[in-house]
């Protein structure tokens, strides 16, 4: 198998599987679990076929004999990842089906084009809403739960241990997600004097956990992908308490907020599927590998629908008040990106970590916000900011990631991540 020069998801998969038998494998395995989930909210998981123990041990010995610097910064440099794959490519089993490689290329192409699918979904949602509005609350809940399950399938107990080894770095990201972002949502809603339903919707979406699209944007921007995974995981788990609590505190004065109902729904849709996925990966790894192999394309389609459906369901409102609604939501995301980056620099983090925290702060699970708004608020306008946020988040995050990618990283960039 020739080494790739475009560093596709299979490159990360090759590196991760080669490193996994070695003591310092966690960082590479985090990369494959994230980069293979490329795309929007996404729960999209690519996987390499399972190989025998002998081949894995041979790969591990191959990497162990290579210079330590080959793998250490792998998460932050596509070039080094590609180089690492070149180093181990001669040791890969020749029996890898070409169809599997082609499948992974197709999945990567589809997932990295996520912003394009969001734009198409937005157009369809506005002008042909009947094509996507069939995905109503119950089906929407199942779809979002499936994506959270697929994210859980890529996590292990070791990921949570790494959170404990990086309390300050992960903690700053958590602070940005659940302090800066909600306060921004509240301040913008009050400053622009939004109506009570729209203000509540803006506050609700600002209190949602990080979205998996942030992992993709971090990868593109040359940020710390492993750190992005950890912060998304932590904010997802914390959502069961933080999302209903902050929404109640900040929006309770505007409309009645059922904090208990929000907590229960968040647990059912976000936390429970994630826990099931983690346990399945930990105790039934072979079974999990088989599931992961068939989820990518399903995830691409499902994620596009979960982005298009909210737009379709509020299309009439968007046609009538589109400009008025876009401004506060876009301002929320832009300010969150900027303040997340500033907070990281104030905390003396390196450029890679600062980009990661900025993206994590600016991109959240808008689909969860839309679902909670539909289930727990009687006024349909509460769901509108979350629908608009789907588009603003995807386009804004992608644009920022491409901008940073073209700027590169300082040669002496500080590494704030501890294995």
Curated annotation (Swiss-Prot):
Residues 1-45 form a transit peptide. InterPro entries: BilAc:Na_symport/Acr3 (IPR002657), Bilac:Na_transpt (IPR004710), Na+/solute_symporter_sf (IPR038770). GO terms for cellular component: chloroplast envelope; membrane. The chain crosses the membrane at residues 106-126, 137-157, 170-190, 194-214, 225-245, 259-279, 291-311, 323-343, 384-404. Gene3D superfamilies: 1.20.1530.20. One of its GO terms (molecular function) is symporter activity. It is a multi-pass membrane protein. Keywords: Chloroplast, Membrane, Plastid, Symport, Transit peptide, Transmembrane, Transmembrane helix, Transport. Induction: By ethylene, gibberellin and submergence. It comes from the Eukaryota. Belongs to the bile acid:sodium symporter (BASS) (TC 2.A.28) family. This is Probable sodium/metabolite cotransporter BASS2, chloroplastic. It comes from Oryza sativa subsp. japonica (Rice).
């Amino acid at each position: 198998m020739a080494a790739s020069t475009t560093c596709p998801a299979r490159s990360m998969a090759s590196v991760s599987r080669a490193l996994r038998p070695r003591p310092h494998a966690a960082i590479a395995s985090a990369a494959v679990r994230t980069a293979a989930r490329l795309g929007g909210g996404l729960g999209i998981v690519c996987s390499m076929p399972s190989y025998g123990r002998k081949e894995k041990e041979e790969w591990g010995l191959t990497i162990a004999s290579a210079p330590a610097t080959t793998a250490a910064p792998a998460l932050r440099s596509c070039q080094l990842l590609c180089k690492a794959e070149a180093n181990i490519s001669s040791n890969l089993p020749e029996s890898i089906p070409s169809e599997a490689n082609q499948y992974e290329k197709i999945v990567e192409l589809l997932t990295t084009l996520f912003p394009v699918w969001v734009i198409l979904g937005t157009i369809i949602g506005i002008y042909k809403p009947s094509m996507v509005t069939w995905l109503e609350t119950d089906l929407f809940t199942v779809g979002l739960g499936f994506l959270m399950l697929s994210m859980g399938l890529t996590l292990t107990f070791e990921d949570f241990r790494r959170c404990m080894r990086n309390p300050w770095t992960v903690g700053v990201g958590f602070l940005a997600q659940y302090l800066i972002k909600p306060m921004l949502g509240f301040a913008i809603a009050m400053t622009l004097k939004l109506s009570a339903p729209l203000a509540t919707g803006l506050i609700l979406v600002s209190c949602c956990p990080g979205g998996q699209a942030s992992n993709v944007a971090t990868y593109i921007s040359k940020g710390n992908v492993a750190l992005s995974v950890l912060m998304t995981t932590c904010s997802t788990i914390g959502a069961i308490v933080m999302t209903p609590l902050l929404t109640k505190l900040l929006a309770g004065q505007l409309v009645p907020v059922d904090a208990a109902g929000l907590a229960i729904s968040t647990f059912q849709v976000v936390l429970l599927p994630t826990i099931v996925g983690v346990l399945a990966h930990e105790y039934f790894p072979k079974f999990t590998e088989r599931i992961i192999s068939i989820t990518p394309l399903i995830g691409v389609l499902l994620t596009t629908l979960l982005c298009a459906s909210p737009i379709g369901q509020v299309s009439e409102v968007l046609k009538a008040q589109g400009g008025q609604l876009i401004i506060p939501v876009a301002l929320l995301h832009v300010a969150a990106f900027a303040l997340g980056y500033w907070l990281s620099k104030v905390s003396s983090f390196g450029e890679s970590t600062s980009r990661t925290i900025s993206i994590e702060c600016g991109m959240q699970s808008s689909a969860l916000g839309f679902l909670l708004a539909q289930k727990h608020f009687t006024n349909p306008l509460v769901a509108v900011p979350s629908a608009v946020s789907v588009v603003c988040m995807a386009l804004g995050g992608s644009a920022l990631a491409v901008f940073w990618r073209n700027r590169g990283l300082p040669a002496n960039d500080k590494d704030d991540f501890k294995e």
